[in-house]
Amino acid sequence: MAATSNSGEDPTLSYHHRSPFRFELLQSISSSDPRYSSLTPSSTNRPFSVSQSLPNSQLSPLISPHWDDSYSQITQKVQKSRKNHRIQLGSIANMSGGESIDIAKVIVKQESSPQNVKRVYNKSKGGTKLLKAGKRMANGEVQNGGLNGASINCRYDSSLGLLTKKFVKLIQEAEDGTLDLNYCAVVLEVQKRRIYDITNVLEGIGLIEKTTKNHIRWKGADNLGQKDLGDQISRLKSEVESMQSEESRLDDLIRERQEALRSLEEDDYCRRYMFMTEEDITSLPRFQNQTLLAIKAPTASYIEVPDPDEMSFPQQYRMVIRSRMGPIDVYLLSKYKGDSAETSDKLGNESDQKAPVGVDTPSLKIVTSDTDLKADYWFESDAEVSLTDLWSNFNS
């Protein structure tokens, strides 16, 4: 049965804390060996500790009188080889009688602890260089407020970028935009040369200017620009939202009016009154004291009015109306005094007066003869003659 020693104390060491090494006795002690017959059964079943002292009657031949010297040599080798994971020890010769005894194989295991620090060894010309790969702090030291428990600032906390942001924020908080560099160094808890590094850059790009040796003033956009820019962005966003809501309201109104017009077109009762009278047209300001023609033509009809300047003197005005889909109705509307009577006398049987039902108007409907339905209508006028006096039909 293998005996193990898990003692936390090393008697050869002067310090008093838990040893990082653990010793295991791998070779079994046979009870049949006469050399070990003097040991009591209780001593073989309990953990073997090197620090235990045996009676003088049991030292020979089990252990040599020079056991203390031999054991000190073993412990010295163990201390020198502390970084090794395994140490195998052979037999130790008896210094006096020439006898040798088997001590057993001792395995030295270094127990891990939170205080251990990982290191990487790199070989160089100058020798072995110790490279630091990581650092761990014990939880107890952090809780007890040791040296390792102090807060360590990261690189970003001491960067010029962060200091510049804090510096600009101090300028924003200043009433007139003027800042004392000494006060700034005290507030930011940095050396004054770091403040000078920031001011040199900001002065170089034209954002600040020095009023005195230790005072600077912001010379960028009013109210530091950034604040105004944020206000302007917020204002523009609100305007866009307002315009979008107004556009949505107008779209709803247009949709409602389109639906109302569609319902009027589909209503038979409303379609009976969907027309304009002569008074509705001539009452418009731009159509007063003008000669007006009302044309009712089918779909795909077109009107051509040649340029009167292309004609020979005197100027003549022509209007060509053509349609291949059906007849064309032309109504002459005029408010000149005596135009209606003169036109009726000259046209005679070639024209008849026709007005919408229930409307008393002197409008004149121009019609063609029954034998010349395919002819175009040509309307010509002189400066002294009315337009209706010169109308005639020509063969196409």
Curated annotation (Swiss-Prot):
One of its GO terms (molecular function) is transcription cis-regulatory region binding. Residues 376-391 are annotated as: Retinoblastoma protein binding. Residues 34-48 have a biased composition (Polar residues). Its main location: cytoplasm. It comes from the Eukaryota. It is found in: Cytoplasm. Residues 155-220 bind DNA. Pfam families: E2F_CC-MB, E2F_TDP. Induction: Down-regulated by light. SUPFAM superfamilies: E2F-DP heterodimerization region (SSF144074), Winged helix' DNA-binding domain (SSF46785). Expressed in meristematic areas, vascular tissues, apical part of the roots, cotyledons, upper region of the hypocotyls, trichomes, young flower buds and pollen grains. GO terms for biological process: cell division; cell morphogenesis; DNA endoreduplication; glucosinolate metabolic process; negative regulation of cell division; positive regulation of programmed cell death; regulation of transcription by RNA polymerase II. Phosphorylated by cyclin-dependent kinase. Phosphorylation is necessary to target E2FC for proteolysis. Heterodimer with DP proteins. Interacts preferentially with DPB, but also with DPA. No interaction with DPB when phosphorylated. Interacts with SKP2A, CDKA-1 and maize retinoblastoma-related protein RBR1. Component of a DREAM-like complex which modulates a variety of developmentally regulated genes and of the mitotic genes in proliferating and differentiated cells. Interacts with MYB3R3 at later stages of leaves development. Belongs to the E2F/DP family. Involved in transcriptional repression. May act by repressing E2F-regulated genes in mature differentiated cells, but is not an antagonist of E2FA. Restricts cell division and is involved in the coordination between cell proliferation and endoreduplication during development. May play a role during the transition from skotomorphogenesis to photomorphogenesis. Regulated by phosphorylation-dependent proteolysis via the protein-ubiquitin ligase SCF(SKP2A) complex. The N-terminal region (1-100) is important for both SKP2A binding and ubiquitin-mediated degradation. PANTHER family: TRANSCRIPTION FACTOR E2F (PTHR12081), TRANSCRIPTION FACTOR E2FC (PTHR12081:SF51). This is Transcription factor E2FC. The lineage of its organism: Eukaryota, Viridiplantae, Streptophyta, Embryophyta, Tracheophyta. The gene is E2FC.
